[in-house]
Structures are given as structure tokens and as C-alpha cells.
């Protein structure tokens, strides 16, 4: 599927629909509009919604946006059904044998043909009058088609209310104009959503992501201005359609894996191209009595991509077990698949996508009774904000009960449009209050009917989120704490303190809670949690209490076309298996297609050369901070077990922070040599020298062994001026000033570079330094610039910062003192000569060019 035409259509459609719907709002709200006379109830509902959304221009813009996406969803849904023959006649499409032309239902109407199951006789008469000229109109065909489109929307509301919901009865008043024009949204929907494109319901998800892409750009532009994300921004900022091969990996290695563990003889494996067979034998897994028990939830389901592929896999499972094909779709929707979402638009599309999956497998799916359709509709729940007033709580909470506890339960969804499925209802309390509500529901009190209805909604949402499932699968929202508004930030601190740095971490914990204690979590998230210190608690939890079944590491460039970053997709068993090995697969940074090819190759060869590694929880726990460094060699892993941390071998320290470098620092050539002192060995000697300026090691560019001797600092009279500049200045570890050291820069875009400094330097907070005996420092300089240390620091220092906490964890073997000093002397001599060949070195004598010229 080529996404570019879909994106072009969807982004254009949003702008076009908002413009047209806004024009219709202005027209129907005009003082003398015919709609005010013919549809006063709908006009009142429209005016109420505009006022609720902020009134005036703000309210009208909000309603226009809502109605625009409502019609976009309906038009693409109808086009999808037209293309697949699920409608008796093309509702938005020309006849199947035509690419262009008027919608088939309009062409039929011109011939006097109407579907009696859809079109009300009165509407048929009005349409006929418009088309034969007996009813006056400035746009008879356009008005006739508008009436037909409204009728078909009402008809499909019976079987798909989530997609064809009656929004206060005014959406029909706001049907976009010019739908029959050559370049209308209908015409472009038909040419973009070809029959080939509509073979897979995945197209619906891509269209929605592209439809909101402009809004997403607005939100991210706001982040750059330090704006925060709340309920209105989270869907646009976090909605990403997952590439199909990642969906397949996650679902096949969770839903498929659990079935294969229960039925090792199953031929389901033949259709799972991304299935990774267990490396070690497994005995501790969820036992299933039948397919109905293979329940799946996606707690951030978006437009339903995970669930639609799970539908395909489950259909194959039911079929293999001998179930009748005609009953399988209903069984899957009733027993197996569940999704929650905070975005109404995405939730509607997810339910639609699952309905299309069912209809594709069961021709009679839409011909069932209304009760059957209601009972077997997709279990997609848009988690809605619900709050009760004090008098309503008086009604819901009987006297003698703990009001504070029960009030908290009833109002737990107050901010559900922000927190969504991260809300964790208590299962026992949910069951208890569900029984209590049944009694209240029998109370014949019209004044309380709304309260009871909302309470029932609370129970429904709580029941979905309080139960456990065989599999939880998700591509959850990614959002760092810096983008969260105060409400969400505080919620994360209170409820998910171990993972408050990013929403995706909270969803890992939530997925664990939603999975059965022997079930599986399949999830794709960012990869920063694998190594940085702030996620150490999450790593410890996963390694101590659970076990990885398989892991894909997608480095450098995200698989999502809109995001730069990196991703980790993994399947986690809720059962702990610390010694059990799992496959960890490292994929190329060269884009989606290359990553997919890498995965296929790794699954065939299962060798490290193709990125396939085996590791267990114990392997990671041997390394400080337990980073997920599955690619580590056995020798390097052993070094962490046997060696001493560098911080126990040498004294590692941070240095001086002047707080005003412009005032206290100079380049050495900017000051008088007479006021400078080089080579002091102590603070006492420096003070006695009477000098003002002393060599200052502030890190600097990448340079090994020797160099970056450029700056001097005002340390006259033992730093009196800097001391007086407190509390802004920070004078750390002054007892080590002027001592010989091994030093390195705090920041490097690649590997760290370590330099040997002689006596005479004060060092900065960005020129981290290690101290000890001269001989030890020589050996450490050799060790830290070695390939061994480079590899160790790739594990220990996952960011561009090489602070002393990370470097101090480098394991030092007992034989470090056996390193050859002569080698260091050669390296220092070469690096020193290179540094001193520049006129910016205080050791400069003459240019090497002079020597070259002299030889010639």
C-alpha cells in the first residue's frame, strides 16, 4: 500500500471538510434560515454544543472540526464498504464497473429505484420530486443526494452506531456541499481508495493518522513553545499507526505463541512468518481450555490495527478447532477481542475495522436482528470522563457505607479523557458496586435515570479495566514528562512513580496489570528505558518478576514514518524465568523495509552475524543498573562479574563550576604570562605564587592521551573572587586541585576520550577527573582508551554524557597494573607533539612546516 496518495487525500479532506462544514454552520444559524423553521430541535442542539465548546468563533470552530471528522469517517467507511460490495448499491461510489461518475444510489433514484429497507417512502418521494422538477431547488441533484446520504447514514446506524452516530441530529444539517462536483471529497475518496487499496481494512487506520497529521504538527509546534499536552492534545500527539510487520511480530508471538504452547501440534505456525520458536523448553504458561479463553486487550487500540490482525489469527485457530465458519466472527467479537481508547474518532474506526473483518468472513453479518447486532458488536470502549455531583453520590452510596471510598470509585473516571486505560479500578469493588447498581436500576425515578445511566457506564469501563486477559498487546502513547500538563504529570507521579518519565513506561506497567498472571504482554515502545538510569526500576521489575519471550531492537530510526528515535518491541511473560534464554534481535537503522528484511534473515539463520542473540535475565543483572545489553560478549559480561568498579580503584571527582565563565575564565594567551603560574602542585603553592591565572581543564573536544590545554582560571589568593561568588559558584573537591589526573570531557557524540594531565591544573565540572598514584593513573589512561573500555562504556553510558557515575562503573581487572608503561609514554609523546605543533599550545616552539621547509 502506497501511503503518499492516502496522506495527500486525508490532509486535503480535513481542510476542505472544515471549510465546508463551517460554511454550513453559518448558513443554518442565519436568523431567517429555513432550517430554523424545519428543524428547530437540531438547531437548538447545535447552538448548545457551540456554547459548550466555548461559544462564538471558538465554539463554532470546535463543532466544525468534530462534524468534519464525523463526515470524513462516514465517507471513507462507506467507500470501503462500496469497494468490497457490502452495500447493495454504491452509496458514495459509482457502479462497480465505473471509476468516475455519480454515486450509484443517485443514479438508481433517477430511474425511480430505491432500496425500501433504507429509504423512507416520504424521503423517496422528496428525492423524486427534486429530480423530476416538481419540487423546486437551486441544486436539485445535490439536495436529492444529501437526502439519500442522510438516509443511508441512519440505516447503518442500526448496525454500526459507533460510526454512524446521531450527533444531536444536526450532523445531517451540516452535510458538506458540492459532494457531486468533479473534485469533491467523494470523487477523491473513490480515486484514492481503489478496490485494491480497500482489500485490507488497514487503509482506514492510515487515513486517520494522515487526517490528524496537521493537528499533530500544531501540537508539536506548541511543545517547542513549552506548551503542555492535555486531553485535547494527547490523541494527536501520540496516535501512530503501527507498521504491519511489527503488528504481526507482536500478535504472532503472543496470541500465536500462547496457542502453540497449548497446542504444539497446531499448524498455525505455518501462517506465522514472524513467529519465534522458544529457545528453551517452557512449562509455566497459561493453560487454555479452548479458543474462547484466548482473550486479548489493546489498552490504547487506536484504529484497531493490533486487534484486526489478532482477528485473523483467532479465526484460523477457531477454524482449526472445527468451529463452523458462520459462527466464528461472532465468537471472536463476543469472547476474544477488546480495546480501549480515549479518542472517539479512533475508537469508532477500530470498531468499524473489526466489523469489516467479521463481515468479510460472514456474509449475513449485517442481516441479523438488532438484538444480535447489539450483543455481538465489537468490544471497543472509548473511556469517557464521568463525574457525579454530591446529590448524585447521595443516591449512589447507601447510608452506612464508606462514602469517601465509594465516591472515589464513582468519580475515578473524572479525567478519563487524559488518563484513559491507565486508570486501575479495583476488581472486587467493581463487582460489588455492579451488584448494588442493579438494585438501583430498578428504581422507577425519571429524575435519577441519567445518574443510573452514567453509573452503568462507569461500571462497564471499570469491568473492562479491572479484569485480566490472556494477552495484552499495544503500541501505547509515547510522551515525555516535559510535554505533560500538570494534571497528567501529577497522576504519573502518584500512580506510576517508577515510570513517570514517559507515558510508554506507564503503559508497560499497565499492560502487566491487564495480563493474566501466566499471560503475555506484547508491546512496542521507545528504547531509552533499556539503558538510562531513570528507568532502572522498570528494568529491575521486568527482570525480577517476569521474563522476556522475545525482543526486537529497532535502532536509530523509528519504524514510524513521522518520528525520529528508536524502538523496542518485545513479548513479556508474566511468569518469572530468570535463567530462561530468549531471542533478542538487533535490526538495521536503515528504514522499515530493511528492518523487516533483517528480521526475516535473523529468524532463518539465528546467528549473531544477523543480529540474533540469546540472553536471560541473569545476564543483565550482572551489569550495574541492569541495562538490556543483549549483544554483550561473554568475556565482557564476565568482566563485570569479576572486575572492580573503577570508582573503587581510583578517586573520581567533579570539579569547579564558576557560574560565570566570561568573568573568571580566559584563553591562556589572553592574559599576562607574568600573572600566570604553570606546574603548581598544591593550593598552598599556587597561593604563594601570587599569580592570578592557573591552567584550567574544562574538558573540550575529542582528544586522547594529551591536550585541550587552552584555558586559565582566576584562582588568585586561593580563589577568593570565585569563593565570594557563592552560592552561584560551586567549588567541588578543592583538595584535588593541582593534582595529576586522568581526565575526560562530560559530553561526546561518540566514544569518550581520556587524557593524562600533569600537576598544575584546576579542573571543571565538565572536565571529570580521576586521581591516584602516578603509576595507577598511567595504567588507567591505557585501560580507559582501550577497545575494552569503549565497549564497556557503550553499555554503561547510554547518552552523550560520560559523568563519573557511568565511568566509575567500568570494571577494572586485577591485572591493570601490568599494562606496559612504555606504550603510554609513546602515545603521550606523539599526542603531546601533535598538540604542541599548534600556536595555541603554551608548549609551542615552532611550526612543523618550518622543519619540513628546512629539510627541503
Where are these regions (language model features)?
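Preference for the N-terminal adenyl/adenosyl cofactor-binding alpha/beta module
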Residues: 1-313, 339-349, 353, 375-438, ...
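Short Ser/Thr-interspersed hydrophobic loop/turn segments at strand-loop and sheet-helix junctions
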Residues: 212, 697, 735-753, 780-794
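Short alpha-helical scaffolding segments that buttress acidic/His motifs in well-ordered protein cores
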Residues: 72, 76, 207-211, 503, ...
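Short, conserved secondary-structure transition motifs
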Residues: 338, 378-390, 556-565, 842-855
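A glycine-rich phosphate-binding loop feature that marks nucleotide/adenosyl-phosphate handling sites
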Residues: 229, 268-273, 370-374, 379, ...
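Cysteine-dependent PTP/DSP-like catalytic domain, specifically the C-terminal lobe
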Residues: 323-348
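Non-catalytic DNA-recognition/assembly elements of restriction-modification systems
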Residues: 241, 301, 627, 633, ...
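Signature of N6-adenine DNA methyltransferases within the class I
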Residues: 2-7, 308, 315, 319, ...
Amino acid at each position: 500500500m502506497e501511503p503518499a496518495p492516502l496522506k495527500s487525500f486525508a490532509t486535503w479532506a480535513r481542510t476542505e471538510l472544515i471549510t465546508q462544514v463551517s460554511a454550513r454552520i453559518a448558513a443554518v444559524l442565519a436568523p431567517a434560515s429555513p432550517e430554523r423553521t424545519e428543524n428547530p430541535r437540531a438547531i437548538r442542539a447545535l447552538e448548545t454544543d457551540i456554547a459548550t465548546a466555548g461559544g462564538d468563533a471558538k465554539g463554532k470552530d470546535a463543532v466544525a472540526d468534530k462534524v468534519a471528522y464525523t463526515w470524513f469517517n462516514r465517507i471513507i467507511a462507506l467507500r470501503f464498504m462500496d469497494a468490497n460490495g457490502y452495500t447493495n448499491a454504491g452509496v458514495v461510489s459509482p457502479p462497480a464497473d465505473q471509476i468516475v461518475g455519480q454515486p450509484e444510489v443517485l443514479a438508481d433514484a433517477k430511474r425511480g429505484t430505491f432500496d425500501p429497507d433504507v429509504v423512507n417512502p416520504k424521503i423517496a418521494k422528496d428525492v423524486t420530486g427534486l429530480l423530476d422538477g416538481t419540487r423546486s431547488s437551486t441544486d436539485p441533484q445535490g439536495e436529492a443526494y444529501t437526502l439519500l446520504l442522510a438516509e443511508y447514514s441512519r440505516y447503518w446506524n442500526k448496525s454500526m452506531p459507533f460510526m454512524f452516530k446521531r450527533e444531536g441530529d444536526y450532523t445531517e444539517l451540516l452535510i458538506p456541499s458540492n459532494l457531486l462536483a468533479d473534485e469533491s471529497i467523494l470523487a477523491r475518496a473513490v480515486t484514492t481508495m481503489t478496490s485494491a487499496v480497500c482489500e485490507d481494512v488497514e487503509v482506514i487506520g492510515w487515513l486517520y493518522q494522515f487526517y490528524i497529521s496537521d493537528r499533530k504538527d500544531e501540537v508539536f509546534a506548541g511543545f517547542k513553545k513549552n506548551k503542555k499536552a492535555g486531553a485535547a492534545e494527547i490523541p494527536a500527539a501520540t496516535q501512530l499507526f503501527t507498521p504491519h510487520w511489527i503488528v504481526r511480530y507482536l500478535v504472532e508471538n503472543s496470541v500465536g505463541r500462547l496457542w502453540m504452547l497449548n497446542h504444539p501440534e497446531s499448524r498455525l505456525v505455518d501462517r506465522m512468518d514472524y513467529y519465534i520458536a522458544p529457545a528453551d523448553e517452557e512449562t509455566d504458561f497459561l493453560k487454555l481450555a479452548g479458543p474462547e479463553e484466548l482473550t486479548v486487550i489493546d489498552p490504547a487500540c487506536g484504529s484497531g490495527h493490533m486487534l484486526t490482525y489478532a482477528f485473523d489469527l483467532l479465526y484460523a485457530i477457531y477454524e482449526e478447532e472445527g468451529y463452523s465458519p458462520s459462527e466464528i466472527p461472532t465468537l471472536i467479537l463476543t469472547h476474544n477481542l477488546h480495546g480501549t481508547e480515549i479518542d472517539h474518532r479512533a475508537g469508532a474506526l477500530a470498531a468499524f475495522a473489526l466489523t469489516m473483518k467479521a463481515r468479510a468472513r460472514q456474509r449475513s453479518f449485517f442481516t441479523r436482528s438488532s438484538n444480535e447486532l447489539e450483543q455481538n458488536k465489537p468490544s471497543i470502549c472509548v473511556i469517557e470522563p464521568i463525574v457525579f455531583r454530591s446529590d448524585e453520590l447521595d443516591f449512589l452510596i447507601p447510608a452506612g457505607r464508606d462514602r469517601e471510598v465509594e465516591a472515589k470509585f464513582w468519580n475515578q473516571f473524572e479525567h478519563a479523557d487524559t488518563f484513559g486505560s491507565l486508570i486501575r479500578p479495583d476488581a472486587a469493588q467493581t463487582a460489588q458496586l455492579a451488584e448494588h447498581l442493579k438494585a438501583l436500576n430498578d428504581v422507577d425515578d425519571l429524575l435519577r435515570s441519567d445518574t443510573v445511566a452514567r453509573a452503568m457506564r462507569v461500571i462497564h469501563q471499570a469491568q473492562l479495566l479491572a479484569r485480566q486477559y490472556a494477552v495484552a498487546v499495544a503500541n501505547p502513547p509515547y510522551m515525555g514528562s516535559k510535554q505533560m500538563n500538570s494534571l497528567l504529570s501529577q497522576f504519573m507521579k502518584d500512580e506510576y512513580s517508577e515510570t513517570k518519565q514517559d507515558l510508554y513506561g506507564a503503559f508497560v506497567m499497565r499492560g502487566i496489570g491487564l495480563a493474566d498472571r501466566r499471560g503475555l504482554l506484547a508491546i512496542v515502545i521507545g528504547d531509552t528505558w533499556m539503558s538510562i538510569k531513570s528507568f532502572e526500576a522498570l528494568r529491575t521489575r521486568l527482570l525480577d518478576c517476569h521474563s522476556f519471550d522475545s525482543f526486537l531492537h529497532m535502532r536509530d530510526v523509528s519504524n514510524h514514518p513521522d518520528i525520529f528515535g528508536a524502538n523496542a518491541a518485545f513479548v513479556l511473560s508474566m511468569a518469572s524465568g530468570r535463567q530462561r534464554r530468549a531471542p533478542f534481535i538487533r535490526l538495521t537503522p536503515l528504514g522499515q523495509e530493511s528492518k523487516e528484511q533483517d528480521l526475516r534473515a535473523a529468524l532463518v539463520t539465528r546467528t549473531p552475524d544477523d543480529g540474533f542473540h540469546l540472553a536471560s535475565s541473569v545476564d543483565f543483572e550482572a551489569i550495574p543498573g541492569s541495562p538490556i545489553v543483549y549483544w554483550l560478549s561473554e568475556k565482557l559480561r564476565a568482566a563485570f562479574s569479576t572486575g572492580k568498579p573503577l570508582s573503587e580503584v581510583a578517586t573520581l571527582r567533579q570539579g569547579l563550576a564558576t557560574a560565570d565563565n566570561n568573568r573568571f575564565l580566559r584563553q591562556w594567551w589572553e592574559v599576562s604570562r607574568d600573572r600566570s603560574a604553570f606546574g603548581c602542585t598544591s593550593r598552598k603553592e599556587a597561593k604563594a605564587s601570587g599569580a592570578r591565572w592557573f591552567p584550567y581543564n574544562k574538558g573540550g573536544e575529542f582528544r586522547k592521551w594529551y591536550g585541550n590545554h587552552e584555558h586559565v582560571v582566576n584562582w588568585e589568593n586561593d580563589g577568593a573572587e570565585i569563593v565570594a561568588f557563592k552560592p552561584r559558584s560551586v567549588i567541588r573537591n578543592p583538595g584535588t586541585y593541582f593534582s595529576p589526573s586522568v581526565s575526560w570531557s562530560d559530553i561526546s557524540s561518540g566514544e569518550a576520550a581520556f587524557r593524562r594531565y600533569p600537576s598544575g591544573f584546576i579542573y571543571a565540572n565538565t572536565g571529570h577527573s580521576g586521581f591516584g598514584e602516578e603509576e595507577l593513573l598511567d595504567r588507567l589512561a591505557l585501560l580507559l582508551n582501550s577497545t575494552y573500555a569503549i565497549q564497556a562504556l557503550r553499555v554503561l553510558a547510554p547518552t552523550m554524557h560520560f559523568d563519573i557515575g557511568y565511568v566509575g562503573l567500568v570494571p577494572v581487572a586485577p591485572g591493570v597494573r601490568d599494562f606496559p608503561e612504555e606504550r603510554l609514554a609513546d602515545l603521550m609523546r606523539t599526542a603531546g607533539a601533535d598538540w604542541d605543533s599548534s600556536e595555541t599550545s603554551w608548549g609551542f616552539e615552532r611550526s612543523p612546516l618550518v622543519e619540513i621547509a628546512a629539510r627541503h
